[in-house]
Amino acid sequence: MSTHNEYDYIIIGAGSAGNVLATRLTEDADVSVLLLEAGGPDYRLDFRTQMPAALAFPLQGKRYNWAYKTDPEPFMNNRRMDCGRGKGLGGSSLINGMCYIRGNAMDYDNWASMPGLEDWTYLDCLPYFRKAETRDIGPNDYHGGDGPLRVTTPKAGNNELFAAMVEAGVQAGYPRTDDLNGYQQEGFGPMDRTVTPKGRRSSTARGYLDLAKPRPNLTIVTHALTDRILFSGKRAVGVQWLRNDQPQRATARREVLLCGGAIASPQILQRSGVGPADLLRSLDIDLVHHLPGVGANLQDHLEMYLQYECKKPVSLAPALKLYNQPAIGAEWLFLGTGIGASNQFEAGGFIRSDAEFDWPNLQYHFLPVAINYNGSNPIKAHSFQMHVGSMRSPSRGRIHVRSKDPREHPSILFNYMSHEQDWREFRAAIRITREIFAQPALAPYSGREISPGSALQTDAQIDAFVREHAETAYHPSCSNKMGHADDPMAVVDGQGRVHGLEGLRIVDASIMPQVVTGNLNAPTIMMAEKLADVIRGRTPLARSTAPYYKANGAPVRKQD
């Protein structure tokens, strides 16, 4: 057993949240931090993680991806579905789609309506979104100008399909918005991305950790697979991990900060003796504290691709040809420009499928090529697609460890599509998307519907297609939810402190009480910025006074 020094804080997981905490906590020179990461470095010369257009590559291997699989999903034809999670400095920000989407203001106001979470309103959170961000066109009431995370906006001269798809959404009666992270999320518009001015992925390893690495009070250990958190009674006092299969440990004077993400954090807690007592006893794990909510309340976003042939030769299909890729790669490598410098998700939208929803329940990503998210099944002809998925499914899943062995993946079950609302939303999503594709703005482009195919019309046909073809949007969350101690399923309080224990916080997407309306990287970074101030004992940033849109019963769409 190799024992490392004592540190003030030990952070488990160098991902979207952990790197923020490591950077902010070490701004205090008298505070020592140990940052543990199961994966390796974020190699800056590896185009797979650094080139935005190469976003599919990290999902295809296991160097940067945990490549979890779910248990057979009972409402999805018993498919074992992908559950990719980032591994390496940067975590999932190293392999995500780089969509900079914060969620809807109402998501956070909804959190704040829950007991114990009163200071999580949108106006409490907005200053921390701004603190994290440097947006390439400058700051305003909603955006930051000097944060570690670089955000790039779509520029004139990008693929003409983006503007056509936004215009088609507006022609179908839905709002137009100039900023999906600004005053009004609802509507169709340009989509920002976490990409540097030189066309590189802006992960939290590049943005945050590069600031902190030179500091003598930060120690980073990669290839450190966390085994368990060590306790003295009810107090977390250290961490044990495996490096080259050899156990090592260190002690924490102040706190252990668990930032493993929505899949890893619950399993680390359960292996450490914190979780549902019956599960832990069945695996002969010594019980430290019974917390039934650990690994419960698991949520995600599910999405479909609707693919169409493109009648004009303007899609990115030629970029998929091997003989075109050296030139694309060279332009990106030497100039930081061109197709390689974009994730190609430069437009999208959020709409309500029905007036029953107070804020958008469907998200769109537009892509000027037809291909699966992980790079499989590319369509060789000119083609394009819309990704559409529901945002706040009432379905709930769970995560259970299978053994004490940290190398064994957990049992993951999302229970996708287990609620009738899920089916209503996906039927509506496919029909609305077809209406958008039929608008005049897309008439010069839209050809044959490749997938699902125009023969698919009835509810039963659509349902069968969803069961067989819907895929994760890679947004697992909520598996250690925040809430008041009176809520038996809450795992942490509004400051990330684990109920019933001392010296242990969780800071990652697992503590969301309900998944947000959009992608998870930006909200997770915001949460870490906010809780970093709490951990450091700093006065919270002043609440924003910026106005924000509420539908307040407005029609879902304009009717001619």
From Swiss-Prot:
InterPro entries membership: BetA, FAD/NAD-bd_sf, GMC_OxRdtase, GMC_OxRdtase_N, GMC_OxRtase_C
Q: What's its catalytic activity?
A: choline + A = betaine aldehyde + AH2; betaine aldehyde + NAD(+) + H2O = glycine betaine + NADH + 2 H(+)
Its cofactor is: FAD
| Signal peptide range | none
Q: Entry's SUPFAM superfamilies?
A: FAD-linked reductases, C-terminal domain (SSF54373), FAD/NAD(P)-binding domain (SSF51905)
GO terms for biological process, alphabetical: glycine betaine biosynthetic process from choline
Sorted UniProt keywords: FAD, Flavoprotein, NAD, Oxidoreductase
Identify a single GO molecular function assigned to this protein.
choline dehydrogenase activity
Task: Please tell me where FAD binds in this chain.
Answer: 8-37
Name-wise, this protein is Oxygen-dependent choline dehydrogenase
State the encoding gene: betA
